[in-house]
UniProtKB/Swiss-Prot annotation:
Protein purpose: Part of the small subunit (SSU) processome, first precursor of the small eukaryotic ribosomal subunit. During the assembly of the SSU processome in the nucleolus, many ribosome biogenesis factors, an RNA chaperone and ribosomal proteins associate with the nascent pre-rRNA and work in concert to generate RNA folding, modifications, rearrangements and cleavage as well as targeted degradation of pre-ribosomal RNA by the RNA exosome.
Alphabetized PANTHER family for the sequence: DDB1- AND CUL4-ASSOCIATED FACTOR 13 (PTHR22851:SF0), U3 SMALL NUCLEOLAR RNA U3 SNORNA ASSOCIATED PROTEIN (PTHR22851)
Gene name of the encoded protein: dcaf13
Organism annotation: Xenopus tropicalis
Protein name (database record): DDB1- and CUL4-associated factor 13
Lineage, opening ranks: Eukaryota, Metazoa, Chordata, Craniata, Vertebrata
SUPFAM superfamilies reported in the protein's UniProt record: WD40 repeat-like
Length: 445
């Protein structure tokens, strides 16, 4: 007698533990699910609404400075350590885990103009208005010992910025000229000067480490190679660039923060015009810093706000502000890509989430799966008008809101004026300048 027996694999329907979810057989044939897209749209809409409900980006404020915060530096080896320099010459080392100051140093007379940490994290360098470069140990002195710098270099002019090489015992300073220093020498290895104006900021390329760039008060951005005796290239803009930052993942890309309220992303190989123009600020942009992924950057502005921009987007995806926060002078993105730190005029350092609605701490597997699913749904439907409107909605201070309206009116007036000038001129005599290239005056090699 022949008997046919049903044979099932228990792995397909039996849970491994009693805490697992029950396995439900599903048929994913689209013909059986005609309302799949409307259901997904509703879920995407609800996920977008909940994202705005839970958007609480502010985490903490670090107070302790007695004057405005002028510069911030990250520790290359420790996520929880941050250094800040103030306008009264005071440098503080902060423990972000405990949210308290672990050490205070009276480093300079006058402003602390620049601050950078050595690549190994054992010491840091400061420059100030007293024409000195000082190297300090990261370790606290023993009981009863005085806080003294490891090394002091006295310069001939005021230093306005400093940055350290990513791998070697070399650092660069700027002021009346750009100087490349060896840590063991009291005189610069190499000096660069192009024109008579002073240099306000200098940055090493983190990938092509022999390349560095500077911003001058003559509205210029200059590229240098520390192996060559002369600068490489100079680009002159309509207005002054306050600072710049190199992309940590793309060796040739950097973003410059300009006085004309915009940020410009350049490719150092093609300096005739920027790759992208980022606009949303309503006052001068004072600082910029990239995320470790190189896909986004954060900017600080004189309009009392900070904004987060995707690299490929011309407009910001996020804006942060508080009632008490004044002009934001410096900003940094943490090395774990989770937080943003900013220092402002009213003597506070604020810690923000990089993603405003992100839940901090450990996530259960189900939470992580739901989060990833909602994120994919939002990306799928982000062009739909209702979802786009909710995702873009932000509350702004009245001052910023009114300035945005005013700038829109001014921009429209300039556009109409150009159209009328072109209409009443000989065809082809009035060119149409692109937004990317109209701010570049000259490129000098």
């Amino acid at each position: 007698m022949k008997v046919k027996v049903l044979c099932r694999n228990p792995d397909d329907y039996v849970r491994e533990t009693k805490r697992d979810l029950q396995r439900v057989p599903r048929n994913y044939d689209p013909a059986l699910h005609p309302f799949e897209v409307p259901r997904e749209y509703t879920r995407a809409l609800n996920a977008t609404k909940l994202e705005r409900v839970f958007a609480k980006p502010f985490i903490a404020s670090l107070d302790g400075h007695r004057d405005g915060v002028n510069c911030i530096a990250k520790h290359p080896k420790s996520l929880s350590t941050v250094l800040s320099g103030a306008c009264d010459g005071e440098v503080k080392i902060w423990n972000l885990t405990k949210r308290e100051c672990s050490r205070t140093i009276q480093a300079h007379d006058g402003f602390v103009r620049g601050l950078c940490v050595r690549f190994c994290g054992t010491s840091f360098f400061t420059v100030g208005d007293d024409k000195t470069v000082k190297q300090w140990s990261m370790e606290s002195p023993g009981y009863g010992e005085k806080v003294e710098p490891i090394r002091t270099i006295l310069g001939k002019t005021v230093f306005t910025g400093i940055d350290h090489h990513m791998n070697d015992a070399i650092f660069a300073t700027c002021g009346q000229q750009v100087d490349i220093w060896d840590e063991q020498r009291s005189a610069p290895m190499r000096s660069y000067a192009w024109g008579v104006d002073s240099i306000s900021s200098i940055k090493f390329n983190p990938i092509e480490t022999h390349i560095l760039s500077s911003c001058g008060t003559d509205r210029s951005i200059v590229l240098y190679d520390k192996r060559k005796p002369t600068p490489l290239k100079k680009i002159i803009l309509e207005m002054r660039t306050n600072t710049l930052c190199w992309n940590p993942m793309e060796a040739f890309i950097f973003t410059a923060a300009n006085e004309n309220f915009n940020l410009y992303t350049y490719d150092m190989r093609y300096m005739d015009g920027p790759v992208k123009v980022h606009m949303d600020h309503v006052s001068a942009v004072l600082d910029v810093d990239y995320s470790p992924t190189g896909k986004e950057f954060v900017s600080a502005s004189f309009d009392k706000s900070i904004r987060i921009f995707p690299v490929q987007s011309g407009h910001s995806r996020e804006v942060y502000h508080t009632k008490r926060m004044q002009h934001v002078t410096c900003v940094r993105w943490s090395a774990d890509n989770k937080y943003v730190l900013c220092g402002s005029d009213e003597m506070n350092i604020r810690i923000w989430k990089a993603n405003a609605s992100e839940k901090l701490g450990l996530l259960s597997p189900r939470e992580r799966a739901a989060q990833n699913y909602n994120q994919k749904l939002k990306e799928k439907f982000h062009h739909h008008p209702q979802i786009k409107r909710i995702a873009r909605h932000r509350h702004l201070p009245r001052s910023i809101y009114s300035q945005i309206k005013e700038q829109q009116i001014m921009r429209e007036a300039r556009r109409k004026k150009d159209v009328n000038r072109r209409k009443h001129s000989k065809p082809g005599s009035v060119p149409i300048p692109s937004e990317k290239k109209k701010h570049v005056l000259a490129v000098v090699e």
